């Protein structure tokens, strides 16, 4: 994980959030956590589809997905509602849709406040534990945000109801985007809180891995530098990892996000996307992608991060 200077550690923040959520204080906590001033917003303009990258909390990302043709927008994981509404106002768009990847407080914890601040929002998600849910979705459910198509991809493992959102414009020349929450990170993947190595293999290789190679990957957290340090440990001879790590350090030093990546890139440096590669299997001392996934995830969970 990557931490801002002088900020709460990720574990401390998560523990604090969980404790407050148990006491019904989640929204109150989220309202006072404004640690993202050190990280910049980023607008990715892909023609008629724009994505505003909105840093949140310590290392989360929210994403405002804009159809420039109709000026309609969706928000992915709006944990800081006022920041979302300010961004929508800045772009002059109508926010109609909430896309929730999973129920964890740092992704879904702003839903209930947001629907109070702006009425009429459609709130999508794949888990009844998601606050303010209006539309429960399943694998391959589809919806529209203006002229943009949104396909819902079930990726259970980090949580049992985790959904990734694949967004494209029919007939458009711009590359599609996928919003992966805590399933796929830049150079990493989420912990297996409610699932298995087999499920994560299916999620990464069979569901996400079969999307177009130029698909932009927008993940839920800024964990890139530490993910790449672990990837370097797994494959020390992989030049793609070294190059991406140097690039990520430069981005982080000037406060810029390291998202998006692309699926094609992830297959070159993400050890969890590379569990079929001999170099990763040899490191794990396994010969099967699923057992390699299990071994590499266990090692990552216990990995002592170098300070470089």
From Swiss-Prot:
Pathway in which the depicted protein is active: Secondary metabolite metabolism; methylglyoxal degradation; (R)-lactate from methylglyoxal: step 2/2
Tissue: Testis.
Top-level class of the enzyme under EC nomenclature: hydrolase
Binding site residues for Zn(2+) 2: 106-107, 182, 221
Any GO molecular function: metal ion binding
Keywords of the record: Acetylation, Cytoplasm, Hydrolase, Metal-binding, Mitochondrion, Transit peptide, Zinc
Binding annotation for substrate: 191-193, 221-223, 297-300
GO cellular component terms listed in the entry, alphabetical order: mitochondrial matrix
Required cofactor(s): Zn(2+)
EC number(s) stated in the UniProt entry for this protein: 3.1.2.6
Transit peptide segment: 1-13
Positions annotated to bind Zn(2+) 1: 102, 104, 158, 182
Modification N6-succinyllysine occurs at: 229
GO biological process, one term: glutathione metabolic process
Pfam family, one: HAGH_C
The family this protein is said to belong to: Belongs to the metallo-beta-lactamase superfamily. Glyoxalase II family.
HAMAP family per the UniProt record, alphabetical: Glyoxalase_2 (MF_01374)
Function: Thiolesterase that catalyzes the hydrolysis of S-D-lactoyl-glutathione to form glutathione and D-lactic acid.
Subunit structure: Monomer.
Protein name: Hydroxyacylglutathione hydrolase, mitochondrial
Taxonomic lineage of the native organism: Eukaryota, Metazoa, Chordata, Craniata, Vertebrata
